[in-house]
């Protein structure tokens, strides 16, 4: 008889926390794909990021709860482009690609889909596959953040905004300073739906200070 795999204490604790989490239960009741929806809902209620008619790019979109919030808040009047290494099941009003944001063909898809149209809001909830080596994982995470920031600066409208998930610790201050150089206003948000024990916070940048030339990417 095959032996059942042992469940670690940390795995059991995570599972218990997950199934008893009020936001997990609420997401199931409200039809959202994950509890992360409430992070964006709370930030939007404070900062008024989403409006009908916008073009939104969601990086690290799977399973799609932020896309759901965006479509809902925009009343299906606008565009939502979603990218993730994992598949995003079809959602009305969302154009999704399963791909690696760091790969040239993924960026080419974005550029071709946008067709030189500027973006109102870039969302990034990206995180690397964790190796368990903290410094390495943090470095890889901020590499993704920097790529998302570069995309945002190049494609946002002058009054656009960039919301990115970051983790406080190594690399945080350097990235926040990069955000401050790129945007007129940068604030930190820690929504209630973020677990207290997590170092996760969100940086919100508004109004790019200087839109870099994007002639090479095909935008005008």
UniProtKB/Swiss-Prot annotation:
Its main location: cytoplasm. GO terms for cellular component: cytoplasm. One of its GO terms (molecular function) is rRNA (uridine-2'-O-)-methyltransferase activity. It is an enzyme of class 2 (transferase). Belongs to the class I-like SAM-binding methyltransferase superfamily. RNA methyltransferase RlmE family. HAMAP family: RNA_methyltr_E. This is Ribosomal RNA large subunit methyltransferase E. It comes from Thiobacillus denitrificans (strain ATCC 25259 / T1).
């Amino acid at each position: 008889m095959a032996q059942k795999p042992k469940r670690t204490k940390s795995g059991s604790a995570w599972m218990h926390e997950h199934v008893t989490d009020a936001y997990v239960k609420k997401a199931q009741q409200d039809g959202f794909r994950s509890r992360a929806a409430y992070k964006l809902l709370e930030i939007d209620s404070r900062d008024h990021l989403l409006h009908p008619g916008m073009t939104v790019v969601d990086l690290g979109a799977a399973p799609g709860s932020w896309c759901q919030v965006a479509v809902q808040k925009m009343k299906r009047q606008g565009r939502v482009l979603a990218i993730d290494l994992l598949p995003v099941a079809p959602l009305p009003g969302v154009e999704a690609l399963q791909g690696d944001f760091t790969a040239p063909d993924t960026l080419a898809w974005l550029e071709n889909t946008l067709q030189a149209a500027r973006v109102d809001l870039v969302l990034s909830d990206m995180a690397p596959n964790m190796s368990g080596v903290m410094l390495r994982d943090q470095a890889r995470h901020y590499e993704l953040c920097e790529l998302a920031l570069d995309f945002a600066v190049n494609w946002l409208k002058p009054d656009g905004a960039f919301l990115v998930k970051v983790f406080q610790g190594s690399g945080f201050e350097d990235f926040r300073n990069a955000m401050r150089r790129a945007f007129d206003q940068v604030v930190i948000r820690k929504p209630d739906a973020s677990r207290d024990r997590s170092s996760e916070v969100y940086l919100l940048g508004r109004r790019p200070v200087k839109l870099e030339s994007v002639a090479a990417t095909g935008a005008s």
